[in-house]
């Protein structure tokens, strides 16, 4: 079982009907993925490890989540006996600010709780082109000790220019991008991006532009590299 801590999952998606979805919601009364991010992550996992059991822990309903919900979700996923916890989310905390330093320590404690229960935590490194192994700002949960922290590569295999990096990044996975000419011409090269699932109740502008049917989109980022690692680990553990 992979626990997905994200924006929820579209349980009505035709390709996710066999994944024995269990849903927990920390933000509102709406079970569906209102944002699309979590369904994209589930799509990557399902492509690599079809029909793996997915438990969804909805900690955000837009671009913002909060640390309290994420901490609760990691504890709940541990108590629910997940094998792997996938966190394709992250934030920066300044170690010189007391409240933020306490938040980092809280994340360390819940990560250690999961690891003591033999659960792997796989988390994204972030997309700000930063070295997350140095400086007063800590990236969490990706970047913490005992977390498998995942950066992103382009189609060519080179580290993506947006991907965070550093000595605490454990592995890099293929996650594409807008293409090498995007910064010069502003044109997106769809061939450089990843195709994945999208909520059937939402419209994906990139999916429409690519003439995909409802339920699919193009995307990229360390968020999508992370479930590649989670799914590969799940496939290995199932052998």
In which residue ranges do the predicted regions lie?
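Terminal peptide-recognition signature
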Residues: 41, 85, 114, 232, ...
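Structural detector of well-ordered beta-strand residues that form the stable sheet scaffold
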Residues: 27, 55, 120-122, 148-149, ...
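Substrate-binding/access-modulating region of protease and related hydrolase catalytic domains
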Residues: 59-146, 156-159, 209-228
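Active-site core segment of subtilase-fold serine proteases
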Residues: 1-53, 72, 79-80, 84-85, ...
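Extracellular S/T/G-rich loop segment that most often corresponds to the catalytic His/Ser-adjacent loop
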Residues: 6, 142-235
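Solvent-exposed loop/turn segments at secondary-structure junctions
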Residues: 7-11, 50, 60-64, 90-94, ...
